[in-house]
A protein has these predicted regions:
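Single transmembrane alpha-helix segments in multi-pass membrane proteins
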Residues: 6-55, 63, 68, 72-89, ...
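Hydrophobic alpha-helical transmembrane segments
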Residues: 8-11, 40, 60-68, 90, ...
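Hydrophobic core segments of alpha-helical transmembrane domains in multi-pass membrane transport
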Residues: 21-22, 46-50, 100-101, 148-160, ...
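Short loop segments and helix-boundary regions at transmembrane helix junctions
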Residues: 30-34, 73-130, 164, 224-225, ...
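Transmembrane helix-bundle core of multi-pass membrane transporters
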Residues: 100-164, 265-273, 299-307
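Helix-loop-helix "hairpin" substructures at the membrane interface of multi-pass membrane proteins
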Residues: 140-218, 241, 246
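Cytosolic-side transmembrane-helix boundaries in multi-pass membrane proteins
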Residues: 176-190, 261-307
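Transmembrane alpha-helical segments in multi-pass inner-membrane proteins
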Residues: 203, 214-278
């Protein structure tokens, strides 16, 4: 029972960064912005969040600066794709190449190339009195980091925004038919830039969560493909906040399972266990990816004269 509870606790904690990055992509794609540069945005967010927390001792300030770093880097993608109408895939990949390398360079410039691993104090959990004593559910949902609670609240806010509000419908219209949205007076360019700001912020926070709330260290490759898994989660969740939550919990479970199997003493090379989340991603995309269709204007450049 303790093993199962430990696995479920790890599932929730490991699902959070993927969930934050997935919500970043959801806000982007709902405005027609297919950003495959999530891995890079999360990497720079992880590094900046760690550095700021290391210097100031504030996890919250680290998360905030991680968000700002994600926004700043994503503006390269935004200017290229929205203003210059460049290809989304090319510039997304450029961010994936540039940002992790920049993060690694900054870390080495600041800390040097020594072998000692720098550490910070991760954000403490907050237990909700009464609720935390509920068997199984209590420790899972009511004795967690504040970022876990805030992320679940963000899922609810996102679901309500896109499903129940006029502003959300206007936002989604930019991703479905930007020319029609423009005729209704919607500032399509403004919405797309707003989407890039939100996407950069959430992806940066997702990366900063890994260093300030989960790991306490910052190493090369700490994001470990979660940006690409987040892309799969958006498709798996059918561009719906609730569906994305379930998808991220599934991927979080796969990640938690491979960690537990590595220390279980099974006589199998640990690399096989490390493959589990990525194999699960490929299998999921193979089974359902071809049957899903996102917003109709996803990845398509918008030009005002095309009205």
């Amino acid at each position: 029972m303790d093993w199962i509870l430990s696995l479920l606790l790890a599932t929730v904690r490991l699902a959070i960064p993927v969930l934050l990055i997935s919500l970043a992509e959801l806000y982007g794609q709902r405005a027609g912005m297919v950003n495959i540069g999530l891995e890079g945005l999360a990497s720079i967010g992880a590094l900046v969040g760690f550095l700021v927390c290391y210097v100031t001792g504030s996890n919250w300030l680290g998360l905030l600066c991680g968000a700002l770093a994600g926004i700043l880097v994503n503006m390269i993608y935004a200017f290229s794709t929205v203003t210059l109408c460049a290809d989304h895939t090319v510039y997304g990949m450029a961010v994936n190449i540039f940002a992790p390398a920049l993060a690694s360079f900054i870390y080495r410039v600041y800390f040097g190339t020594g072998s000692d691993l720098k550490q910070i104090t991760t954000m403490a959990s907050i237990a909700i009195p009464g609720l935390k004593d509920i068997p199984v559910i209590g420790p899972l949902l009511f004795d967690q980091s504040p970022m876990v609670y805030l992320t679940f609240v963000l899922v609810i806010v996102t679901a309500v925004f896109f499903g129940k509000t006029r502003a959300g419908l206007s936002y989604k219209s930019v991703g479905e038919h930007p020319q029609a949205a423009a005729t209704l007076g919607i500032n399509v360019i403004g919405v797309k830039y707003l989407a890039c700001v939100i996407c950069g912020a959430l992806a940066g926070i997702g990366g900063a969560y890994l260093t300030t709330c989960y790991s306490s260290t910052c190493t090369d490759g700490i994001v470990a493909g979660r940006g690409f898994i987040a892309l799969a989660a958006v498709i798996f969740g059918r561009w719906n906040a609730g569906g994305i939550l379930l998808a991220c919990l599934f991927f979080g479970f796969c990640d938690a399972l491979q960690i537990r199997l590595q220390v279980s003493g099974i006589a199998i090379p640990y690399q096989f266990f490390q493959m589990i989340p990525y194999v699960a991603t490929v299998v999921v995309l193979s089974l359902i990816g071809t049957r899903q269709a996102g917003p109709k204007a996803n990845g398509k450049p918008y030009r005002r004269e095309q009205r």
